[in-house]
């Protein structure tokens, strides 16, 4: 996932 702007 991307934990900075898009989570999942």
UniProtKB/Swiss-Prot annotation:
Secreted as UniProt keyword: yes
GO terms for cellular component: extracellular space
UniProt keywords, alphabetically: Antimicrobial, Plant defense, Secreted
Disulfide pairings: none
Localization per record: Secreted, Extracellular space
Protein name per UniProt: Antimicrobial peptide 3
Tissue specificity remark: Found in the liquid endosperm contained in green fruit of coconut palms, also known as coconut water (at protein level).
GO biological-process terms attached to the record: defense response to Gram-negative bacterium; defense response to Gram-positive bacterium
